[in-house]
């Protein structure tokens, strides 16, 4: 899209259309803060759904991709890359499947799906509104809240108190999304869409939630012909004790199918999850799991049961009706064949951590007179498998920085000691048995009146910790930085301290 105007000027008789546009990357239900920082890669192996995870060769953001064509009458339109995630090409990682989709491999929409819906649908006939992210973070943590709507006006409320109102113009790149930032506390976010006359036409809510208490099953249909060609897609999600969806649930779920049906497969849409599709148990990812049910060639009932340690089971009854035209037995057997690798996890009973709550009794401001503070961590649910917590000090992009050190007090408490002025984050993460970070929580600190941190010129410096740049600088892999594909980019590092035998000039 960024090349269209020049190409049209050079070749006014050419037909232009976008065969592969966007290429933004996102993981369903994963949010890397803050929104203002571009974050292509992170410790959890996921891509942020806030809209701040982009590759250096793709569109700079979803807004640019969606709006550009509206102002280019010589363009026939575009095909987003991609509609669905697909197995392979897992830019920017080396995991199972891609992150380009607006819908994940399990068929669950990501937030980006609702963004394009807000641009490409008519509020007069199909009004819509969507809030992101979910609402469960550290107390006081500043959270970027985004609202997508096709309406001309949106308002955000917290616990029925108005946070703000915004008028939107869906032809303007910088005025297509309603954005707010507010400190987290438990409660209810409500977004309301209004038409030109000020009438409410749509609303969406996000509730704070607790640990998973029960499972819920819902099917795309409750009855199918018993022809061996139909599949039933059953969504499994977790609810807390008050009935609210647990949007970051990671519970391991076992699925059994009885009667005139068989379990064809399970998928949660998580690119970092290598467990087989054709097994009988998987973990929820961002609170969801899909079970694919294949009816037999006989009419009757199918009973689907989902169970998880410590949770109430969920049961769903489906029906199949007699049908004259049936598929071949060979095709039906191919559909239901089990992956032998699934036996390795079939009886797993682990209870993974779904979130980590970090807190600090003192204000998160460190000074020369009080350069340290103690941070505590609480993992959820309380009965999750015991595992070590990994701690580190990073900048907003997740790069380890030398501004402070950490001292372990016990399994859930750590002391931070600041060495220099600056803003930084303490990150706490877990692996949930995978050998690599699967989720983290972070707490922001500010250090002042301590002094400037000089870089060591006699050791390596992380490339993305530059202090000044001219030209285009984009996201790189592994918390790195990439120079632009066109023009000249210069990057400056400092300040350095060369010691008594070097020169600082």
Language model features with spans:
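Substrate-binding/catalytic cleft of secreted carbohydrate-active enzymes
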Residues: 1-139, 143
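Catalytic cores of secreted or luminal carbohydrate-active enzymes
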Residues: 79-214, 244-246, 252, 449-475
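Proline/serine/threonine-rich low-complexity linkers at boundaries of modular beta-sandwich domains
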Residues: 116-128, 206-214, 336-356, 482-484
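Extracellular ectodomain segments of secreted/surface proteins
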Residues: 117-140, 349-368, 490-499
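Structural beta-strand segments of beta-rich domains
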Residues: 141-145, 230-234, 371-375, 489, ...
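Extracytoplasmic soluble-region selector
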Residues: 164, 181, 193-195, 202-205, ...
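Low-complexity, acidic Ser/Thr/Pro/Gly-rich terminal tails and inter-domain linkers that flank the onset
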Residues: 209-225
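Short beta-strands within extracellular/lumenal beta-sheet-rich domains
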Residues: 475-504
């Amino acid at each position: 899209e960024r090349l269209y105007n020049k190409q049209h000027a050079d070749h006014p008789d050419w037909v232009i259309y976008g065969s592969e546009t966007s290429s933004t990357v996102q993981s369903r239900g994963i949010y890397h803060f803050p929104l203002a920082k571009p974050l292509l890669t992170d410790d959890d192996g996921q891509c942020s759904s806030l809209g701040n995870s982009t590759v250096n060769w793709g569109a700079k953001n979803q807004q640019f991709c969606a709006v550009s064509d509206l102002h280019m009458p010589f363009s026939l339109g575009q095909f987003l890359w991609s509609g669905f995630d697909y197995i392979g090409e897992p830019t920017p990682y080396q995991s199972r499947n891609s992150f380009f989709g607006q819908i994940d491999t399990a068929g669950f929409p990501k937030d980006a799906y609702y963004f394009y819906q807000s641009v490409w649908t008519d509020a007069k006939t199909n009004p819509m509104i969507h809030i992101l992210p979910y609402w469960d973070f550290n107390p006081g943590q500043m959270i970027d809240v985004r609202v997508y709507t096709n309406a001309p006006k949106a308002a955000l409320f917290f616990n029925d108190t108005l946070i703000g109102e915004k008028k939107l113009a869906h032809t303007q790149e910088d005025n297509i999304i309603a954005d707010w930032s507010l400190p987290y506390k438990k409660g209810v976010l409500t977004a309301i869409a209004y038409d030109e006359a000020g009438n409410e036409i749509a609303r969406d809510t996000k509730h704070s939630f607790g640990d998973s208490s029960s499972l819920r099953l819902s099917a795309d249909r409750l009855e199918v012909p018993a022809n061996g060609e139909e599949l039933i897609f059953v969504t499994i999600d977790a609810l807390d004790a008050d009935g609210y969806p647990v949007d970051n649930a990671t519970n391991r779920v076992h699925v059994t199918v009885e009667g005139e049906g068989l379990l064809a497969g399970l998928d949660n849409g998580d690119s970092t999850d290598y467990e087989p599709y054709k097994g009988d148990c998987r973990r929820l990812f961002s609170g969801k799991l899909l079970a694919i049910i294949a009816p037999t060639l006989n009419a009757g009932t199918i009973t689907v049961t989902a169970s998880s340690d410590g949770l109430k089971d969920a049961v769903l009854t489906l029906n199949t009706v007699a049908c004259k035209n049936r598929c071949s037995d060979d095709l039906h057997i191919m559909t239901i064949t089990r992956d032998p690798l699934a036996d390795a996890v079939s009886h797993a009973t682990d209870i993974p951590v779904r979130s980590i709550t970090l807190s600090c009794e003192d204000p998160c401001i460190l000074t020369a007179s009080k350069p340290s503070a103690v941070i505590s961590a609480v993992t959820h649910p309380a009965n999750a498998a015991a595992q070590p917590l990994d701690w580190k000090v990073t900048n907003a992009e997740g790069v380890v920085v030398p501004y402070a050190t950490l001292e372990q007090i016990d399994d859930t408490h750590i002391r931070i000691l600041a060495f220099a002025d600056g803003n930084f984050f303490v990150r706490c993460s877990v692996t949930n048995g995978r050998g690599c970070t699967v989720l983290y929580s972070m707490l922001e600190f500010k250090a002042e009146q301590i002094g400037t941190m000089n870089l060591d010129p006699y050791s390596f410096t992380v490339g993305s910790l530059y202090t000044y740049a001219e030209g285009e600088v984009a996201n790189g892999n592994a918390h790195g930085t990439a120079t632009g594909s066109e023009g000249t980019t210069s990057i400056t590092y400092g300040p350095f301290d060369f010691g008594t035998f070097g020169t600082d000039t």
